[in-house]
Regions:
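ABC nucleotide-binding domain signature
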Residues: 32, 75-86, 116-118
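Conserved ABC transporter NBD signature motif
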Residues: 57-64, 77, 110-115
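Helix-to-loop junction immediately C-terminal to a conserved catalytic motif
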Residues: 49
Length: 123
């Protein structure tokens, strides 16, 4: 389970972006983060995936505190961020782009099984 509690982050003291964000996502659960442009959706995901360090709050994954853990350590736990738009690999298929984060710890059968489940839910 991924649990985010009281997450706060900003790009400067004058520009807070995340103010007391909290949510849970169970294993195998698909969760959507919704909001308008500039609301902090991508910042939240970058913070959870270790690309940004929160000012305050905690992030736990399966009971382990991963708050402030470097992105590579978070990736080894199985959490990764699929980049948006121009950050995708244009020569790769959707399947290949989505499975990039899994290559560090899962075998090809596990990757295929997981992505097949996503394809069924979102054809």
């Amino acid at each position: 389970m991924l649990e985010v509690k009281n997450l706060k982050f900003g790009y400067s003291a004058m520009m807070p972006v995340l103010n007391d964000i909290s949510f849970q996502a169970g294993n195998q659960e698909i969760v959507a983060i919704l909001g308008s442009n500039g609301a902090g959706k991508t910042t939240t995901l970058k913070t959870v995936s270790g690309l940004l360090k929160p000012w305050e709050g905690t992030i736990t994954y399966n009971g382990e505190d991963i708050t402030g853990m470097p992105a590579y350590g978070v990736l080894k736990k199985g959490i990764s961020l699929v980049p948006e738009g121009r950050m995708l690999f244009g020569k790769l298929t959707v399947y290949e782009n989505l499975s990039m984060g899994a290559y560090t710890r899962k075998n090809q059968d596990e990757i295929k099984k997981t992505l097949d489940m996503v394809y069924e839910l979102f054809p």
